[in-house]
Swiss-Prot record:
Keyword field: Hydrogen ion transport, Ion transport, Membrane, Transport, Vacuole
One Gene Ontology cellular component annotation held by this UniProt entry: fungal-type vacuole membrane
Organism superkingdom: Eukaryota
Subcellular location: Vacuole membrane
InterPro entries associated with the record: ATPase_V1-cplx_f_g_su, ATPase_V1-cplx_fsu_euk, ATPase_V1_fsu_sf
PANTHER family reported in the protein's UniProt record: V-TYPE PROTON ATPASE SUBUNIT F, VACUOLAR ATP SYNTHASE SUBUNIT F
Gene: VMA7
Extent of the signal sequence: none
Subunit structure and binding partners: V-ATPase is a heteromultimeric enzyme composed of a peripheral catalytic V1 complex (components A to H) attached to an integral membrane V0 proton pore complex (components: a, c, c', c'', d, e, f and VOA1).
Family affiliation: Belongs to the V-ATPase F subunit family.
Protein topology in the membrane: Peripheral membrane protein
Source organism (scientific name): Vanderwaltozyma polyspora (strain ATCC 22028 / DSM 70294 / BCRC 21397 / CBS 2163 / NBRC 10782 / NRRL Y-8283 / UCD 57-17) (Kluyveromyces polysporus)
GO MF annotation list: proton-transporting ATPase activity, rotational mechanism
Protein's name in the database: V-type proton ATPase subunit F
Amino acid sequence: MSVDKRTLIAVIGDEDTTTGLLLAGIGQITKETNEKNFFIYEDGKTTKEQILNNFINYTQERQDIAILLINQHIAEKIRSDIDNYTNAFPAILEIPSKDHPYDPEKDSVLKRVRRLFGE
């Protein structure tokens, strides 16, 4: 599928973050396959495998996702996979959550940009 077909924003986030983004209008359930473009992480219940499976689904299997938003504290649980992701689409953006502030030192995209500019 071409880049112009990538029209959705996906989210892997905690309940508060995901709910806020759904209320803002990013929620989508695909009619044909009944797939959601969001995954709610539950602390103490969600496994690393579940996070990784959704990450792979949104970045490799689904061809309609343009941007993947992921809470940074959840991204830490699959850091090596995020660091090794090099495709332009979907773009991965790490975002803060209500209980976990954003740390630019952990952000893979920011690290790549710094390396590119020799910082």
